Amino acid sequence: MYLDRGRVDRIVKGALTLAFALALAGGTAKAADTLHFAVGPLQPTPGETKKAFDPFFKRLAEQLGVTYTLEATTDWAGIAVALTSGQVDVAWMGPWGYVIAHNQGAGDAVATAKYDGKPVYHAIVIARPDLQISKWPDDGKGLRISFADVGSTSGWLIPTFWLKSRGLDPKIYFQYHEGATHAANEIAVANGQTDLATDYDRNRTAMIESGAISPQATKIIWTSDDLPNDAIAVRAGLDPAVAKKVQDIVTAITDEQATTILPKHYTGFIASTHANYKLIEDAGIAVGALKNQK
Protein backbone atom coordinates (compact mmCIF):
# COMPACT_ATOMS: atom_id res chain seq x y z
CA MET A 1 0.00 0.00 0.00
CA TYR A 2 1.00 3.59 -0.39
CA LEU A 3 -0.25 6.91 0.86
CA ASP A 4 -2.08 9.11 -1.64
CA ARG A 5 0.46 11.61 -2.99
CA GLY A 6 -1.67 14.65 -2.20
CA ARG A 7 -1.89 13.56 1.42
CA VAL A 8 1.85 12.99 1.57
CA ASP A 9 2.57 16.56 0.52
CA ARG A 10 0.35 17.93 3.26
CA ILE A 11 1.67 15.57 5.91
CA VAL A 12 5.31 16.27 5.11
CA LYS A 13 4.72 19.96 5.75
CA GLY A 14 3.49 19.04 9.21
CA ALA A 15 6.73 17.20 9.95
CA LEU A 16 9.18 19.97 9.09
CA THR A 17 9.13 21.59 12.52
CA LEU A 18 9.78 18.27 14.23
CA ALA A 19 12.57 17.39 11.82
CA PHE A 20 14.28 20.70 12.52
CA ALA A 21 13.95 20.18 16.26
CA LEU A 22 15.45 16.73 16.03
CA ALA A 23 18.32 18.02 13.95
CA LEU A 24 19.07 20.57 16.64
CA ALA A 25 19.12 17.80 19.21
CA GLY A 26 22.21 16.45 17.49
CA GLY A 27 23.30 12.91 16.87
CA THR A 28 21.42 10.27 14.93
CA ALA A 29 18.38 8.17 15.70
CA LYS A 30 20.54 5.10 15.21
CA ALA A 31 23.06 5.92 17.94
CA ALA A 32 23.39 2.93 20.24
CA ASP A 33 23.51 4.95 23.48
CA THR A 34 20.71 7.41 22.71
CA LEU A 35 17.15 6.82 21.60
CA HIS A 36 14.94 9.52 20.13
CA PHE A 37 11.36 9.48 21.38
CA ALA A 38 8.35 11.45 20.17
CA VAL A 39 4.76 11.87 21.29
CA GLY A 40 1.79 13.27 19.40
CA PRO A 41 -0.35 16.26 20.47
CA LEU A 42 -2.09 14.62 23.41
CA GLN A 43 -2.23 17.84 25.44
CA PRO A 44 -3.30 21.36 24.39
CA THR A 45 0.29 22.50 23.72
CA PRO A 46 3.60 20.75 22.92
CA GLY A 47 5.03 22.01 26.20
CA GLU A 48 2.19 20.50 28.21
CA THR A 49 2.43 17.25 26.26
CA LYS A 50 6.16 16.95 26.84
CA LYS A 51 5.77 17.64 30.56
CA ALA A 52 2.96 15.11 30.91
CA PHE A 53 4.67 12.27 29.05
CA ASP A 54 8.33 12.80 29.95
CA PRO A 55 8.11 10.64 33.12
CA PHE A 56 7.03 7.68 30.99
CA PHE A 57 9.81 8.10 28.45
CA LYS A 58 12.37 8.77 31.17
CA ARG A 59 11.49 5.47 32.84
CA LEU A 60 11.60 3.67 29.49
CA ALA A 61 15.07 5.04 28.75
CA GLU A 62 16.34 4.16 32.22
CA GLN A 63 15.14 0.57 31.91
CA LEU A 64 16.68 0.30 28.45
CA GLY A 65 19.94 1.72 29.78
CA VAL A 66 20.12 4.60 27.28
CA THR A 67 19.93 8.38 27.25
CA TYR A 68 17.06 9.92 25.33
CA THR A 69 15.60 12.93 23.60
CA LEU A 70 11.88 13.68 23.55
CA GLU A 71 9.92 15.82 21.14
CA ALA A 72 6.20 16.61 21.25
CA THR A 73 4.69 17.23 17.82
CA THR A 74 2.16 19.91 16.96
CA ASP A 75 0.06 17.60 14.78
CA TRP A 76 -0.63 13.91 14.28
CA ALA A 77 0.70 13.81 10.74
CA GLY A 78 4.17 15.10 11.58
CA ILE A 79 4.97 12.28 13.96
CA ALA A 80 4.13 9.74 11.24
CA VAL A 81 6.69 11.25 8.86
CA ALA A 82 9.30 11.48 11.63
CA LEU A 83 8.96 7.77 12.43
CA THR A 84 8.96 6.80 8.75
CA SER A 85 12.11 8.81 8.05
CA GLY A 86 13.97 7.28 10.99
CA GLN A 87 14.29 10.57 12.89
CA VAL A 88 12.43 8.92 15.77
CA ASP A 89 13.12 5.49 17.26
CA VAL A 90 10.02 5.04 19.41
CA ALA A 91 6.80 7.02 19.11
CA TRP A 92 3.59 7.34 21.09
CA MET A 93 1.20 8.07 18.28
CA GLY A 94 -2.43 8.05 17.24
CA PRO A 95 -3.80 4.99 15.41
CA TRP A 96 -4.12 6.68 12.00
CA GLY A 97 -0.70 8.29 12.24
CA TYR A 98 0.71 4.86 13.06
CA VAL A 99 -1.02 3.27 10.05
CA ILE A 100 0.28 6.06 7.78
CA ALA A 101 3.80 5.48 9.07
CA HIS A 102 3.56 1.71 8.78
CA ASN A 103 2.38 1.92 5.19
CA GLN A 104 5.30 4.17 4.39
CA GLY A 105 7.81 1.68 5.71
CA ALA A 106 7.98 2.33 9.46
CA GLY A 107 8.10 -0.51 11.94
CA ASP A 108 5.26 -2.12 13.84
CA ALA A 109 3.18 -1.23 16.83
CA VAL A 110 4.45 -3.05 19.90
CA ALA A 111 1.87 -1.88 22.44
CA THR A 112 -1.53 -0.22 22.73
CA ALA A 113 -2.32 2.20 25.55
CA LYS A 114 -5.01 1.46 28.10
CA TYR A 115 -7.24 4.32 29.24
CA ASP A 116 -9.30 3.66 32.36
CA GLY A 117 -8.33 0.03 31.92
CA LYS A 118 -9.50 -0.28 28.32
CA PRO A 119 -7.43 -0.33 25.10
CA VAL A 120 -10.14 1.52 23.16
CA TYR A 121 -11.55 5.04 22.79
CA HIS A 122 -14.09 6.87 20.63
CA ALA A 123 -14.27 9.62 18.05
CA ILE A 124 -16.95 12.19 18.76
CA VAL A 125 -18.61 15.13 17.08
CA ILE A 126 -19.42 18.03 19.37
CA ALA A 127 -21.83 20.91 18.90
CA ARG A 128 -22.75 24.25 20.37
CA PRO A 129 -25.10 23.50 23.27
CA ASP A 130 -27.86 25.71 21.85
CA LEU A 131 -28.08 23.81 18.56
CA GLN A 132 -31.08 21.52 18.15
CA ILE A 133 -29.59 18.40 16.61
CA SER A 134 -31.65 15.28 17.19
CA LYS A 135 -30.76 13.41 13.99
CA TRP A 136 -27.15 13.21 12.84
CA PRO A 137 -25.94 14.19 10.32
CA ASP A 138 -29.23 15.44 8.84
CA ASP A 139 -29.70 18.27 11.32
CA GLY A 140 -26.12 19.43 10.83
CA LYS A 141 -26.28 19.91 7.07
CA GLY A 142 -24.89 23.27 5.98
CA LEU A 143 -23.50 24.16 9.40
CA ARG A 144 -19.89 25.14 10.09
CA ILE A 145 -17.72 22.19 11.07
CA SER A 146 -14.06 21.98 12.05
CA PHE A 147 -12.16 18.73 11.49
CA ALA A 148 -8.72 18.09 13.00
CA ASP A 149 -5.57 17.60 10.92
CA VAL A 150 -5.49 14.85 8.30
CA GLY A 151 -3.23 12.71 10.49
CA SER A 152 -5.85 12.46 13.24
CA THR A 153 -7.81 9.24 13.70
CA SER A 154 -10.81 10.59 15.57
CA GLY A 155 -10.62 14.14 14.26
CA TRP A 156 -10.37 13.37 10.56
CA LEU A 157 -10.23 9.74 9.41
CA ILE A 158 -13.11 8.15 11.30
CA PRO A 159 -15.70 10.94 10.87
CA THR A 160 -14.72 11.20 7.19
CA PHE A 161 -15.08 7.43 6.77
CA TRP A 162 -18.41 7.36 8.60
CA LEU A 163 -19.88 10.13 6.46
CA LYS A 164 -18.50 8.85 3.15
CA SER A 165 -19.77 5.34 3.88
CA ARG A 166 -23.22 6.95 3.88
CA GLY A 167 -22.62 8.72 0.60
CA LEU A 168 -21.84 12.11 2.13
CA ASP A 169 -18.78 14.25 1.40
CA PRO A 170 -18.14 16.39 4.50
CA LYS A 171 -16.49 19.08 2.38
CA ILE A 172 -19.76 19.53 0.49
CA TYR A 173 -22.30 18.63 3.16
CA PHE A 174 -21.02 21.17 5.70
CA GLN A 175 -19.22 24.50 5.73
CA TYR A 176 -16.00 22.58 6.13
CA HIS A 177 -12.65 23.43 7.69
CA GLU A 178 -9.80 21.11 8.67
CA GLY A 179 -6.41 21.30 10.34
CA ALA A 180 -7.21 22.35 13.91
CA THR A 181 -5.96 20.63 17.04
CA HIS A 182 -8.50 18.81 19.17
CA ALA A 183 -8.17 21.37 21.94
CA ALA A 184 -8.71 24.19 19.45
CA ASN A 185 -11.84 22.44 18.18
CA GLU A 186 -13.34 22.29 21.67
CA ILE A 187 -12.53 25.94 22.32
CA ALA A 188 -13.88 27.02 18.93
CA VAL A 189 -17.23 25.36 19.59
CA ALA A 190 -17.37 26.70 23.15
CA ASN A 191 -16.69 30.23 21.86
CA GLY A 192 -19.17 29.97 19.00
CA GLN A 193 -16.48 30.26 16.33
CA THR A 194 -17.83 27.10 14.71
CA ASP A 195 -21.05 25.15 15.08
CA LEU A 196 -19.62 21.64 15.08
CA ALA A 197 -16.23 20.00 15.49
CA THR A 198 -14.56 16.63 15.73
CA ASP A 199 -12.79 15.41 18.84
CA TYR A 200 -12.25 12.25 20.89
CA ASP A 201 -13.79 11.35 24.21
CA ARG A 202 -10.50 11.23 26.12
CA ASN A 203 -9.57 14.77 25.10
CA ARG A 204 -12.94 16.24 26.02
CA THR A 205 -12.78 14.55 29.42
CA ALA A 206 -9.25 15.85 30.03
CA MET A 207 -10.18 19.41 29.05
CA ILE A 208 -13.18 19.39 31.37
CA GLU A 209 -11.13 18.02 34.26
CA SER A 210 -8.39 20.62 33.72
CA GLY A 211 -10.93 23.44 33.65
CA ALA A 212 -10.14 24.38 30.04
CA ILE A 213 -13.83 24.03 29.20
CA SER A 214 -16.96 23.47 31.25
CA PRO A 215 -19.08 20.35 30.71
CA GLN A 216 -21.84 22.58 29.37
CA ALA A 217 -19.62 24.42 26.86
CA THR A 218 -20.08 21.74 24.20
CA LYS A 219 -22.29 18.71 23.75
CA ILE A 220 -21.64 15.35 22.11
CA ILE A 221 -23.96 14.60 19.19
CA TRP A 222 -22.21 11.55 17.69
CA THR A 223 -19.95 8.81 19.03
CA SER A 224 -18.07 6.23 16.99
CA ASP A 225 -17.71 2.52 17.60
CA ASP A 226 -14.68 1.36 19.61
CA LEU A 227 -11.32 2.39 18.16
CA PRO A 228 -7.92 0.98 19.16
CA ASN A 229 -6.09 3.34 21.48
CA ASP A 230 -2.75 5.06 20.86
CA ALA A 231 0.11 2.92 19.60
CA ILE A 232 3.64 2.64 20.87
CA ALA A 233 5.47 2.09 17.58
CA VAL A 234 9.10 1.61 16.60
CA ARG A 235 10.98 2.63 13.49
CA ALA A 236 11.96 0.14 10.83
CA GLY A 237 15.48 -1.12 11.39
CA LEU A 238 15.45 -0.75 15.16
CA ASP A 239 17.23 -3.71 16.74
CA PRO A 240 14.47 -6.34 17.25
CA ALA A 241 15.86 -7.05 20.71
CA VAL A 242 15.40 -3.38 21.63
CA ALA A 243 11.87 -3.36 20.20
CA LYS A 244 11.02 -6.44 22.28
CA LYS A 245 12.47 -4.79 25.39
CA VAL A 246 10.31 -1.72 24.74
CA GLN A 247 7.25 -3.95 24.53
CA ASP A 248 8.16 -5.88 27.68
CA ILE A 249 8.88 -2.73 29.68
CA VAL A 250 5.70 -0.87 28.82
CA THR A 251 3.36 -3.86 29.15
CA ALA A 252 4.81 -4.59 32.60
CA ILE A 253 3.65 -1.20 33.94
CA THR A 254 1.14 -1.78 36.73
CA ASP A 255 -1.91 0.33 37.53
CA GLU A 256 -0.07 1.72 40.56
CA GLN A 257 3.02 2.61 38.54
CA ALA A 258 0.85 4.21 35.89
CA THR A 259 -0.39 6.78 38.39
CA THR A 260 3.14 8.14 38.81
CA ILE A 261 4.52 8.02 35.26
CA LEU A 262 1.48 8.41 33.00
CA PRO A 263 -1.09 11.20 32.64
CA LYS A 264 -4.40 10.80 34.44
CA HIS A 265 -6.62 7.91 33.29
CA TYR A 266 -3.83 6.06 31.45
CA THR A 267 -3.48 2.70 33.19
CA GLY A 268 -0.78 0.90 31.22
CA PHE A 269 -0.49 -1.03 27.96
CA ILE A 270 -1.31 -4.29 26.26
CA ALA A 271 1.02 -6.02 23.80
CA SER A 272 0.02 -5.18 20.25
CA THR A 273 0.77 -5.81 16.59
CA HIS A 274 -0.18 -4.16 13.33
CA ALA A 275 -3.23 -6.44 13.11
CA ASN A 276 -4.85 -4.56 16.00
CA TYR A 277 -5.05 -1.48 13.76
CA LYS A 278 -6.56 -3.17 10.69
CA LEU A 279 -9.90 -1.38 11.05
CA ILE A 280 -8.03 1.95 10.90
CA GLU A 281 -6.15 0.81 7.81
CA ASP A 282 -9.42 -0.33 6.20
CA ALA A 283 -10.97 3.09 6.87
CA GLY A 284 -7.97 4.79 5.28
CA ILE A 285 -8.37 2.69 2.15
CA ALA A 286 -12.11 3.34 2.04
CA VAL A 287 -11.73 7.14 2.06
CA GLY A 288 -9.00 7.04 -0.57
CA ALA A 289 -6.15 8.15 1.68
CA LEU A 290 -4.50 4.74 1.38
CA LYS A 291 -4.60 2.82 -1.89
CA ASN A 292 -3.87 -0.80 -2.69
CA GLN A 293 -0.63 -1.08 -4.62
CA LYS A 294 -1.61 -3.31 -7.52
What kind of feature is each model-predicted range?
Residues 13-25:
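Bacterial N-terminal signal peptides
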Residues 27-31:
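Sec/Tat signal peptide C-region and signal peptidase I cleavage site
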Residues 37-59, 63, 96, 119-186, ...:
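Bilobed "Venus flytrap"/periplasmic-binding protein-like clamshell domains
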Residues 38-42, 115-124, 212-250, 264-279:
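Periplasmic-binding protein-like
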Residues 67, 146-162, 248-294:
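Ligand-binding clefts/hinges and TM-proximal coupling segments of bilobed small-molecule sensing domains
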Residues 67-74, 172-181, 219-222:
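Short beta-strand-to-loop elements that line the ligand-binding cleft
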Residues 77-91, 104, 138, 182-202:
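Short helices/loops that flank or line small-molecule/ion binding pockets
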Residues 95-105, 162-165, 190, 195-215:
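A ligand-binding cleft/hinge motif common to bilobed small-molecule-binding domains
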